[in-house]
């Protein structure tokens, strides 16, 4: 159960990051978003000490590359927010810094308050 919640939270965080980045041709499923962000969960539940896990950055970069259209980015955002709502202990301060730490630049704040409809 905790693993499922962690995966959902990671999905939410990554999805928010993906909101600024594009998702590949066609639609991206919530399962794909969640799987891409799952490696980020333990980092986001911790103190932020140490490096971001390589798998986390790989997932963030992959989602960023995949989100090529506004509808796909908005859908990814919704998926991430939904998943994050089911995960406890996420440090959203760390989440907002993940894109930069992974070398990805997105023009949106990663936050539970992000309005997915405003994602372009």
Curated annotation (Swiss-Prot):
<dbReference type="InterPro" id="IPR016140">
    <property type="entry name" value="Bifunc_inhib/LTP/seed_store"/>
</dbReference>
<keyword id="KW-0446">Lipid-binding</keyword>
<keyword id="KW-1015">Disulfide bond</keyword>
<dbReference type="InterPro" id="IPR000528">
    <property type="entry name" value="Plant_nsLTP"/>
</dbReference>
<feature type="disulfide bond">
    <location>
        <begin position="40"/>
        <end position="56"/>
    </location>
</feature>
<dbReference type="InterPro" id="IPR036312">
    <property type="entry name" value="Bifun_inhib/LTP/seed_sf"/>
</dbReference>
<feature type="signal peptide">
    <location>
        <begin position="1"/>
        <end position="26"/>
    </location>
</feature>
<feature type="disulfide bond">
    <location>
        <begin position="57"/>
        <end position="102"/>
    </location>
</feature>
<comment type="similarity">
    <text>Belongs to the plant LTP family.</text>
</comment>
<feature type="disulfide bond">
    <location>
        <begin position="77"/>
        <end position="116"/>
    </location>
</feature>
<keyword id="KW-0732">Signal</keyword>
<comment type="function">
    <text>Plant non-specific lipid-transfer proteins transfer phospholipids as well as galactolipids across membranes. May play a role in wax or cutin deposition in the cell walls of expanding epidermal cells and certain secretory tissues.</text>
</comment>
<dbReference type="GO" id="GO:0090378">
    <property type="term" value="P:seed trichome elongation"/>
</dbReference>
<dbReference type="GO" id="GO:0006869">
    <property type="term" value="P:lipid transport"/>
</dbReference>
<dbReference type="GO" id="GO:0008289">
    <property type="term" value="F:lipid binding"/>
</dbReference>
<protein>
    <recommendedName>
        <fullName>Non-specific lipid-transfer protein</fullName>
    </recommendedName>
</protein>
<dbReference type="Pfam" id="PF00234">
    <property type="entry name" value="Tryp_alpha_amyl"/>
</dbReference>
<keyword id="KW-0813">Transport</keyword>
